[in-house]
A protein has these predicted regions:
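Extended, well-ordered protein cores
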Residues: 2-468
């Protein structure tokens, strides 16, 4: 269904269309604020076009799965909020755009004092209109070790309001009437965008900023500004290793290594890299005219998505990644990054690298479809034939379900590499999903359950086509 069809279908327009408009507006704003991000988008588009030309079979798979039309749309952004009230209201804001909180991520064990969720659409149809999602992190003030600093940070955050009056009015209107009409949707996008805009003026003195940054640079990024500026946007590539190699050639300062699994024939989950965050001028509350402070937080990211893994597959992935990092003593450094890549590839060699094998071992999620041979045999297919038998007979085929979520270790690695300063070890704190959900105002959805439902729905539809 086209976006124009959605808009004319009813008085209140589709939340998916509002999300598509918001995503485009966000991209335009970020390219103006961070021109280097525009350069990154052009590089990714070039690499994708070259990849599709050289791999027509991959292009056919993407076209069949409806992934091709949305390939060059930004896939996600990220923000960090400071209070439970901000988190609860941001949930309501994203709900206007059909975005739901999916999964709980605790980044504290990886040395980042936040816990997070991803706001995204949850159906293939909605993703087809706009795949945009936002990784949203809530600062864990209880992890600030200095009591006086913790209380000061809480007081600073309590004074700010990150939403315009117009945004709050339109959120309430959408909730009251079950959506927004076309004109109000445009007003909403304009008003909501202000929450994510960059502000050069800090809300703290230079000394307060330094005290927050000394505790953790992310704490300063959350507390010291008027709102949760978007800290990165992310296009999708089909060949992240080529993008990583070409960034320095284009004058783009790339982070040290690609986060996530190694390069494979059958991509797993999510691989990410970025250009390093900009060192930007800011003004503290006690600065004189002509003086400028510095802040490092905003960057451009690239992602390459692979197949979603089952709980069994994810457990194996986590085990292998932990083993690779233990081999080099933690996250890769300039001194051992080549060794890390070699160890990662060697250790992951035990993870099957063919979709048929991953499916047979229950490691990944797949869509099912009836083949032309299967449709021709409809009505004569044995009622007790297993899915494996139907696949072996060529009556069913599988296609990998794209992983639409995130990886906490990778997210932490991206954050750490773009905040500057010395990376710290993990916080001695337990995950607290219950507290996060209380602050959010609802339970997060299970990403595993969503993939399972999607897979089973496709299987039932395919079996019906076989006359089962």
């Amino acid at each position: 269904m086209s976006v124009s069809t959605i808009a004319s279908a009813q008085h209140t327009i589709s939340p998916d269309l509002i999300r598509a408009r918001f995503s485009q507006a966000m991209s335009d704003m970020y390219q103006q604020e961070v021109p280097l991000y525009g350069d990154l988008i052009h590089l990714v588009a070039e690499v994708n076009a070259d990849f599709l030309e050289k791999h027509p079979e991959e292009a056919a798979v993407l076209a069949h799965s409806q992934e091709l039309p949305r390939l060059n749309l930004e896939r996600h952004g990220a923000i960090r909020v400071g209070t439970a009230e901000e988190l609860a209201t941001i949930r309501r804001l994203f709900a206007v755009m059909g975005m739901h909180p999916v999964a709980y991520y605790d980044l504290a064990p990886a040395g980042v004092p936040v816990h997070s969720t991803a706001f995204r659409a949850i159906t293939a149809e909605a993703m087809g209109v706009s795949p945009f999602r936002v990784f949203c992190s809530l600062l864990r003030l209880e992890l600030i070790e200095n009591t006086e600093l913790r209380e000061r940070a809480a007081a600073i955050l309590a004074k700010r309001c990150i939403f315009t009056d117009e945004a709050l009015r339109l959120i309430a209107l959408s909730e009251a009437q079950g959506g927004l009409d076309d004109a109000d949707a445009n007003r909403f996008v304009e008003a909501a965008l202000e929450t994510f805009r960059w502000h050069h003026e800090a809300t703290v003195s230079a000394a307060e900023y330094q005290a927050l940054a000394d505790q953790h640079r992310l704490i300063a990024d959350v507390v010291a500004f008027k709102g949760p500026h978007i800290n990165h946007l992310t296009p999708r590539t089909l060949d992240i290793d080529t993008v990583q190699r070409l960034m320095p050639e284009r004058g783009i300062d790339a982070k040290l290594s690609v986060e996530g699994p190694p390069q494979r024939q059958c991509a797993l989950l999510l691989r990410q890299t970025s250009f390093k965050a900009l060192n930007e001028d800011i003004r503290f509350t006690d600065q004189q005219a002509g003086e400028a402070g510095k802040h490092t937080a905003r960057f451009g990211e690239i992602e390459q998505r692979g197949v979603a893994l089952t709980a069994k597959g994810r457990a194996l992935y986590d085990q292998l990644l932990d083993e690779a990092r233990e081999k080099i003593g933690g996250a890769p450094t300039p001194a051992n990054v080549d060794t890390y890549y070699q160890e990662l590839a060697r250790i992951f060699s035990v993870f099957p690298d063919a979709h048929a094998d991953m499916h047979a071992q229950g490691l990944a999620f797949y869509h099912y479809r009836a083949t032309e041979q299967g449709k021709a045999a409809a009505g004569s297919v044995a009622a007790d034939a297993s899915v494996e038998a139907l696949l072996a007979q060529g009556l069913l085929a599988i296609e990998p379900i794209t992983y639409e979520d995130f990886l906490p270790v990778s997210a932490a690695g991206i954050f750490q590499s773009n905040l500057g300063g010395v990376e710290r070890g993990g916080y001695a704190s337990m995950s607290n999903q219950q507290l996060f959900e209380r602050d959010l105002g609802q339970a997060v959805l299970s990403e595993i359950a969503l993939y399972e439902q999607d897979s089973q729905a496709s299987l039932q539809a395919a079996l019906q086509q076989l006359g089962r």
